Amino acid sequence: MKKNYRFSTALSQFSADSFRQGKSLRFPSPAKLNLFLYINGKRADGYHELQTLFQFLDYGDWLEISARADGEIHLTPQLPGVKEEDNLIYRAAHILQQNTGCTLGADIRLDKILPMGGGVGGGSSNAATVLVALNYLWKTRLSLSELADLGVKLGADVPIFIHGNAAFAEGVGEKLTDCEPPEKWFVVLKPETSISTALVFTHPDLPRNTPKRPLTRLLTEEYGNDCEKVVRNCYPEVEETLTWLLKYAPSRLTGTGACVFAEFDNEKSAQAVFDMKPASVSGFVAKGCNRSPLHQWLDKIS
């Protein structure tokens, strides 16, 4: 079956066989945006205290997964420059095996569309989808909370994808409160550069003392990203792309970048701006969604 990277289209066409790809089952791995990101302090262990609002996008990768009896994990295709044992997909499968004693293995095929290192959660989303999907296929019966405890060992953003709802995150990202921000349309652009998260979080100009505010107040104020100024100053490609996008709509950085996004009230307006984008940047148009497409998909097949 032809894959559609807008999951709502696949969901609307759902049938008993629509999630099958041969012997494999297909699972969505959606993108996310940080609608705002504020850094409230730095802890003694080096981690930063933050407040951020996560929302999923109706767009992302697909993972085709089937169980195998020999306990081996086979992943295709291999990501360029990433050793198999360092790949988050491979590590997610192994951590579930190790923590449940499951003797089954898996064949996993990644259909990758999300940019790597873009701040839209591609790797974290892939890891979360593998944990949730294999928990279903292997019948290991861990709760979402137990899966999230495994996921955080793989990356700070993995639990939000396992959690499955748009959420306000505090602390180092581990304290989650369900939230329902407006589900707007977004133009997401990826400048031709890669961001060093370590550079951003160690930069002397990074704000580290933004006062904590209650969610009710944050939702009514203009959204911002404390990492944006540093990234714009250090990466001219991001500065150029964001400056262009700001001519058309409220726009900002997601996470530490490199992706930037603009929000619109409807698809037509978003698509019109996207169609004018500079040729040097890639990107996509997608709608925000407060319920993860992965969990919507699981609701259908369960």
UniProtKB/Swiss-Prot annotation:
Superkingdom of this protein's organism: Bacteria
Keywords carried by this UniProt record: ATP-binding, Isoprene biosynthesis, Kinase, Nucleotide-binding, Transferase
Species per Swiss-Prot/TrEMBL record: Actinobacillus succinogenes (strain ATCC 55618 / DSM 22257 / CCUG 43843 / 130Z)
Record flagged with keyword Nucleotidyltransferase: no
Full protein name: 4-diphosphocytidyl-2-C-methyl-D-erythritol kinase
Keyword Protein transport: no
Residues that coordinate or bind ATP: P115, M116, G117, G118, G119, V120, G121, G122, G123, S124, S125
UniProt GO MF annotations: 4-(cytidine 5'-diphospho)-2-C-methyl-D-erythritol kinase activity; ATP binding
Pathway: Isoprenoid biosynthesis; isopentenyl diphosphate biosynthesis via DXP pathway; isopentenyl diphosphate from 1-deoxy-D-xylulose 5-phosphate: step 3/6
Active site location: K32, D157
Catalytic activity: 4-CDP-2-C-methyl-D-erythritol + ATP = 4-CDP-2-C-methyl-D-erythritol 2-phosphate + ADP + H(+)
GO biological process, one term: terpenoid biosynthetic process
Protein's gene: ispE
Protein EC: 2.7.1.148
InterPro entries noted in UniProt: GHMP_kinase_C_dom, GHMP_kinase_C_sf, GHMP_kinase_N_dom, IspE, Ribosomal_Su5_D2-typ_SF, Ribsml_uS5_D2-typ_fold_subgr
Protein family: Belongs to the GHMP kinase family. IspE subfamily.
Function comment: Catalyzes the phosphorylation of the position 2 hydroxy group of 4-diphosphocytidyl-2C-methyl-D-erythritol.
